[in-house]
Swiss-Prot record:
Protein name, as recorded: Glucans biosynthesis glucosyltransferase H
GO MF term (any one): hexosyltransferase activity
EC number: 2.4.1.-
Source species of the chain: Shewanella sp. (strain ANA-3)
Matching HAMAP family: MdoH_OpgH (MF_01072)
Length: 727
């Protein structure tokens, strides 16, 4: 069958035409990290189109450095009265690292606080006609198809009603490796096409091999279809976006010829467990303060968070091709946390990267439990620590390097905090058990007294707590000032109760997460790869025995730290109790925060409520309704046996199989592919062949038309020759 004949067949088989449009190949070469590519950075189209204001940098970064210098000086003064010991020098160094980390967030929070006090500017581009084309990409990996396809359905329908639907195409880019989910995706795609083909162009592709994970998935699309589009709007499997946000991003990109990437700040929604609702509330009340402040001072050197952002295709394909790092994982191989790196490379090429902190209507979901958060953070931790290999990249803007460093510190801060706690504990135990050395080896008429300035230490403690909790305080002040905002979360009293509850529960969870991150860092330094596991999205509950196993070291660490503290005094134990209680109760805290029932209880009494929960956007309501409908549509999933048995079903399936050419003759064959070939060749019937396949092999067969045709030619069941002769 010729290519043209194949296209006609697909058009007849699938409602709305072929599963994917015709390819328009384009180059997306891996970028050099050791030298600046020729022609970079590009000359901006608009004068000062990619230039940022130095004054904003001076206020935030300079303010953070000045605040850190003051705190470090004060800490040194606390120790310096009687001379600084080696252990005190260590504590001073650890304090400096940790304080610099929180000082930057605090100063960003100040900027965000004052920006949010202003009235938002009207959208001057709202009526702008779109003459550019945007591909909206929804990558998915072993996710629930009802969630993914229903979200695309409602977003596509809403966008079609704006009058701008002609400027957008929708793509579900699957990297699914589970054969059952892959067949469910095909069923869901047929339903989606049936619903949307009259008003939207929606496509589906499942890769045979998920090389380089999500980054490789998007790069594969770019190399084969990217040249058809001016922009790429990248979503995640749990993303939702209002139509005004989608068109707003495209209008901003169209209006700014120097914009390479525009990132929204997503709001968290659909949390059902206590842990998810805790994250939702914190992100909604405190998140805008940090996000707005960050967007204000980074300006044209913003960041990319992997989804809910629009990217100029020319900038992405021309500047953000990711190289493989030398060596093996976890520090070598494919770049895992690709988003920060892609933003840095786009900015290096002379395009601006902007955080659209003033654009609402962007949504995502969050992990439902501490364990699920730990699984996700293990992967992110490896990707962020891998950025230590990216930091020396030639030509990166210093703000881009700071973004990379911030990502690294998001996980290294936990070991540094733990070391700070242990050092302080050692100083207390040293003072309690070890006789001071009043006269050192150097001759002196006066003794060296191991004393500290307790008043200054207490004052510094209050300053540190103020810096640490500053962004939370700013968020609460904004909430209390805005009556509409306060009413949207249940009123000021409920809001204050929610804040108090969030602070207490977060304080209990923080030491658990500290040890989880410490364990992740240690396992990465020991050379262990994270793998790629699909995320749980809804229920976070687990058996208690599983939780005991997961948190056994956290509880043991809490007992050991408590024992060490009580060796000194009950006062020290009391000071450490906020951290220790969380560790001692790690298992019940993990169980309760991952419970949907407990989450629903707090929802009923109005604690940790958000505006999006109490008054959800129409797109969120429709997505929930559509998801239930999709669940009903695909409640009876196809099987490979049914596909082989039913010729019409086979044609439908083949119409949705990726048309990328199979392995060329003479090229190396992968072991799993060779095994499948042998099993298909030796099988006497379809039933025996299917019984031999494992899940990986079955997924490979589903993506290989030649193997499917070979299996289809086999009899459904084996009939012995003597029985045939007898009949």
């Amino acid at each position: 069958m010729t290519v043209s004949e194949n296209s006609v067949l697909e058009t007849e088989v699938l409602v709305g035409g072929s599963a994917m449009p015709n390819e328009r190949p384009g180059a997306m070469e891996p970028q050099s990290l050791s030298q600046m590519p020729e022609g970079f950075p590009r000359r901006s189209t608009v004068a000062n189109g990619v230039r940022s204001k130095v004054s904003r940098r001076f206020f935030v970064v300079g303010g953070a450095l000045a605040l850190s210098a003051f705190a470090i000086y004060e800490m040194g003064a606390v120790f310096s009265i009687g001379g600084i010991t080696p252990l005190e020098y260590l504590m001073l160094a650890l304090f400096a690292i940790n304080f610099c980390w929180i000082a930057l967030a605090f100063c960003s929070g100040i900027a965000g606080f004052f920006m949010l006090l202003k009235k938002p500017k009207p959208n001057e581009l709202e009526q702008t006609e779109l003459h550019t084309r945007t591909a909206i990409l929804m990558p998915t990996y072993n996710e629930s198809p009802d969630r993914v396809f229903s979200a695309v359905s409602v977003m596509a329908e809403a966008l079609s009603q704006t009058g701008h639907g002609h400027a957008f195409d929708w793509f579900i880019l699957s990297d699914t490796t589970d054969p059952e989910i892959a067949l469910l995706e095909e069923q869901a795609f047929l339903v989606l096409r049936q619903e949307t083909h009259k008003h939207s162009r929606v496509y589906y592709r499942r890769r045979r091999k998920n090389v380089a994970r999500k980054a490789g998935n998007v790069a594969d699309f770019c190399r084969r279809w990217g040249s058809r589009y001016d922009h790429l709007l990248v979503l995640d499997a749990d993303s939702l976006m209002e139509s005004s946000t989608i068109t707003g991003l495209a209008q901003r990109m169209q209006a700014d010829p120097d914009a390479g990437l525009i990132q929204t700040i997503p709001s968290l929604i659909n949390g059902t467990t206590l842990m998810a609702r805790l994250q939702q509330f914190a992100a909604r009340i405190y998140g805008p303060v940090i996000g707005t402040g960050l967007g204000w001072w980074v300006q044209k050197e913003g960041n990319f968070w992997g989804h809910n952002a629009i990217i100029r295709t020319e900038a992405f394909m021309g500047a953000a091709g990711l190289p493989n790092l030398k060596g093996k994982p976890p520090f070598g191989g494919h770049i895992l946390s690709h988003d920060f790196v892609e933003a840095a490379l786009i900015r290096r090429a002379g395009w601006s990267v902007v955080i659209a902190y003033d654009l609402p209507g962007s949504y995502e979901e969050c992990p439902p439990s501490i364990v699920d958060l730990a699984v996700r953070d293990r992967r992110w931790c490896q990707g962020n620590l891998q950025h230590s290999r990216i930091l020396p990249t030639k030509g990166l803007h210093w703000v881009s390097r700071l973004h990379l460093m911030t990502g690294i510190m998001a996980y290294l801060s936990s070991p540094f905090w733990l070391l700070l706690i242990l050092t302080g504990l050692m100083l207390a135990l040293q003072a309690h058990f070890i006789r001071p050395e009043y006269f050192t080896d150097q001759f002196s008429l006066f003794p060296t007294w191991p004393i500290m300035d307790s008043d200054r230490a207490l004052r510094l403690f209050y300053i540190t707590m103020g810096v640490l909790f500053g962004p939370k305080i700013f968020g609460v002040l904004l909430l209390l000032k805005d009556g509409n905002f306060a009413r949207s979360v249940g009123g000021r009293i409920k809001a204050i109760l929610s804040v108090i509850f969030e602070v207490i529960l977060s304080a209990l969870i923080a030491p658990i997460m500290m040890f989880i991150h410490c364990g992740a860092v240690m396992s990465i330094l020991m050379g262990r790869d994270s793998g790629w596991s699909p995320q749980r999205r809804d229920d976070g509950s687990m058996p208690w025995l599983t939780l005991i196993y997961r948190h056994r070291w956290h509880m043991l660490a809490g007992v050991m730290l408590g024992y060490a503290a009580i060796l000194d005094s009950l006062t020290l134990l009391a000071w450490m109790s906020p951290a220790l209680i969380g560790l001692w109760l790690a298992v019940p805290i993990s169980a309760w925060t991952g419970s949907i029932k407990i989450g629903e209880f707090f929802k009923r009494i109005g604690i940790l409520a958000t505006p999006e929960e109490r008054n959800p956007a129409p797109i969120c309501i429709r997505a929930q309704e559509a998801r239930a409908a999709y669940q009903a549509h695909i409640e009876q999933p196809w099987t490979l046996a049914q596909v082989l048995k039913d010729p019409a079903l086979m044609e439908l399936h083949l119409a949705m199989v990726d048309k990328q050419p199979l392995r060329a003759a003479g090229t190396p064959i992968e072991p799993v592919e060779a095994i499948v070939h042998v099993k298909v060749h030796e099988a006497q019937c379809q039933q025996s062949a299917l019984a031999l396949f494992n899940r990986q092999e079955m997924a490979l067969v589903l993506a290989n038309p030649l193997m499917l045709r070979s299996l289809q030619k086999l009899p459904e069941q084996f009939v012995p020759e003597d029985l045939v002769s007898f009949c």
